[in-house]
Amino acid sequence: MFKGILLCVLFAVLSANPLSQPEGFADEERDVRGLASFLGKALKAGLKNDDDVNERDVRGFASFLGKALKAALKIGANALGGAPQQREANDERRFADDEDDVNERDVRGFGSFLGKALKAALKIGANALGGAPQQR
């Protein structure tokens, strides 16, 4: 019986595909390793007064800084309202209909807002009256 279980587990392990990681994760990990290597060699060079900093490490550090700057700019652009093309597309969609027309999406959004506000008001009222029946 144990041989059968062992063989099944062995077969499952041998036939399983390794989990692949997204490419972005591997690139970030490689950049962090490159940064650590660069800083270590720079520290070692500073202590020994020897310039053995590798050009590959310098390029890796520059790549890391470039990606960090690109990510920071993307976050900043999204915080300010998205990319210019996205803002223009949103403006066109917003003003495509007549101003007096009521959009179904707006109605659903307002209904959702009212539902959440009513639920929150009921919860606050229940807590003000002594809590929910389960808490008494």
Curated annotation (Swiss-Prot):
Disulfide bridge map: none
Record's protein name: Preprocaerulein type I'
Alphabetical UniProt keywords: Amphibian defense peptide, Cleavage on pair of basic residues, Secreted, Signal
Residue positions assigned to the propeptide: 27-136
Native organism: Xenopus laevis
Lineage: Eukaryota, Metazoa, Chordata, Craniata, Vertebrata
Tissues showing expression: Expressed by the skin glands.
Subcellular location: Secreted
The protein's role, per its UniProt record: The pharmacological activities of caerulein are quite similar to the physiological activities of gastrin and related peptides.
GO BP terms in the entry: antimicrobial peptide biosynthetic process; innate immune response
